[in-house]
Design a protein with these regions (language model features):
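Catalytic and substrate-binding regions of extracellular carbohydrate-active enzymes
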Residues: 1-209, 214-220, 233
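Polysaccharide-binding surfaces and accessory modules of carbohydrate-active proteins
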Residues: 3-5, 222-277
Length: 277
């Protein structure tokens, strides 16, 4: 068994605010006043409220004489959940679909990754001749790490097995032969935390990578199914950009080729008259 305090949250009007306990860190030393320290159990909770612009929002925590629990959940099956605005459907291979229930539009097969080799200069991507790309994971798993009426979090773990590095090989007489992948293999594990909040049209995504390989480029694949241009954040502006290469194949014979990837400042997406992502 585990000891859990019973308490309530109330807003400024005195109304109860539903919450969900996310985690408890026990026996934590915290500064109470000046050089006075006390030992606490630190509760991390999830709840929904409104924050005033250029002001503050007050919540009151008070002990509860009754047990505080909820049997409600946003999950609709083993591998799906909805908050009435968005619906999530997870697949055994480690991808998931997002459906906007307001428009009925679905964005499918998210959480795909692509590995290929990298011999660039740190500024531009350059691939070696005979560049091989790894497109599928060798193992995937799905866990529900948080399940309640306010927040539901799924954790996807995908493991990729790829050659550990590139080798610059020599031949007889120490002549340089070329670049090839090593015969030793290494594993790259990618954990994706997908968080769905009550009454929210935003999906929380957090990625954690455990890497034991080198000399590769990792790309996140997020298909939208929306044709046309994209928009990208830049300093003090949102720019419309052509999907793919702006110049098409015009730089095939040039000294410096045009790269598909362009720099962005924290925002990129696609949209049409029905919305976007």
């Amino acid at each position: 068994y585990e000891f859990v305090n019973s308490f309530q949250l109330r807003n400024e009007a005195g109304a109860l605010v539903p919450y969900q306990i996310v985690s408890i860190r026990r026996n934590q030393m915290r500064q109470f006043q000046w050089n006075v320290f006390r030992r606490y159990d630190v509760y991390r909770v999830a709840f929904r409220t409104k924050l005033r612009a250029a002001g503050w929002t007050t919540l009151r925590l008070e002990p509860s004489p009754d047990f505080v629990r909820s049997y409600r959940t946003m999950r609709t099956s083993q591998r799906s959940a909805t908050n009435g605005i968005l619906r999530l459907d997870f697949h055994p291979e480690g991808t998931f679909d997002v459906t906007d229930l307001r428009s009925g539009r679905s964005f499918r097969n998210w959480n795909e990754f692509r590995f290929d080799r990298e011999i660039g200069d740190g500024w531009n991507h350059v691939e070696p001749i005979g560049n091989a790309a790894l497109l599928c994971s060798s193992e995937s798993s799905l866990r529900v790490t948080l399940d309640g009426p306010e927040r539901t979090t799924f954790e996807i773990t995908r493991r990729y097995r790829l050659p550990a590095s590139l080798r610059y090989e020599g031949g007889l007489g120490e002549n340089y032969v070329g670049i090839r992948e090593s015969e030793e293999f290494a594993e790259v594990a990618i954990r994706t935390m997908v968080t769905l909040d009550r009454d929210s049209d935003q999906l929380g995504l957090h990625f954690a990578i455990e890497n034991h390989a080198e000399d590769f480029r990792l790309q996140l694949i997020a298909p939208t199914g929306i044709p046309g241009n994209c928009f990208a954040g830049q300093n003090f502006a949102i720019l419309n950009r052509k999907a793919g290469r702006e110049l098409g194949d015009a730089t095939e014979g040039g000294f410096e080729r045009e790269f598909i990837e362009k720099n962005i400042s924290g925002l990129i997406g696609k949209r049409d008259a029905s919305g976007g992502v």
